[in-house]
């Protein structure tokens, strides 16, 4: 298992490096001048002398490979530069906004797990009957409706007409319900449908038939033989959804005025705050690859065949 963990971890390094190169080049070779944006956000006149000194200060007068090496070296030491807008270290700003984003993403993840698992099991138990049709309809809505559109519908229904929940802001538990549901709905619909399909597929396999012939009742067979094997695809999906939840907060946080990293990143994009954009994009890459690593390790722990397969190809 240790060899498998090391192998998976070493594969992350070239992935993150390749992503960092793409991020850097997209921002450096894109339209606009970082020096001009820095002066604009600092309320300084963009005279030729100021532009030249700003380019020197930001290192923009150096070759691209030198700029990238300097940025990567500082990023490895958690130095992502100074925000053009706030004139504060980017990492400090990120850490200030991160708790609100983690709170929202955590609430959405709990909602996904508490709803998708029971819905998937319920649909699989009542295949081609009313509960199954209801869950499949919910799944259809979830994959068809963008989260920002669902957010507007929830605000209109529960904030404008019924006035049960606040439309925006950050405070008590009432403020987190609508944004958490908006982020979680698509993922819980996908997971419920995936668990249903996995359970039905496993239920038709030979070892489940033999378990029933040995005298196990339906609940014992489901718990011991079906759910364990059917949970592997869902674990993979949940791991992917964790990164999507954090990335999906960008739009939702702006709709609900939630003071998180996503709202901060959108503001940086509009202001062309290059250090913040670079930091946020690289952070999202790291979140996705770490989530993939955790999912791979969980799958390997639950299914020894994965470890044996990796060992055979080592």
Swiss-Prot record:
Positions in the Periplasmic compartment: 30-103, 158-169, 253-274
GO molecular function: dipeptide transmembrane transporter activity; nickel cation binding; nickel cation transmembrane transporter activity
Disulfide bridge partners, by residue number: none
NCBIfam families, A to Z: nickel_nikB, Opp2B, PRK10352.1
Main function: Involved in a nickel transport system, probably translocates nickel through the bacterial inner membrane.
Source organism phylogeny: Bacteria, Pseudomonadati, Pseudomonadota, Gammaproteobacteria, Enterobacterales
Domain ABC transmembrane type-1: 98-295
Subcellular location: Cell inner membrane
Membrane-traversing stretches: 9-29, 104-124, 137-157, 170-190, 232-252, 275-295
Membrane topology of the entry: Multi-pass membrane protein
GO biological-process terms attached to the record: nickel cation import across plasma membrane
Protein keywords: Cell inner membrane, Cell membrane, Ion transport, Membrane, Nickel, Nickel transport, Transmembrane, Transmembrane helix, Transport
Main location group: membrane
Cytoplasmic topological domain residue ranges: 1-8, 125-136, 191-231, 296-314
Name of the protein: Nickel transport system permease protein NikB
Coiled-coil positions: none
Quaternary structure (record): Probably forms a heterodimeric pore with NikC.
Protein family per UniProt: Belongs to the binding-protein-dependent transport system permease family. OppBC subfamily.
One GO cellular component term noted in the UniProt record for this chain: plasma membrane
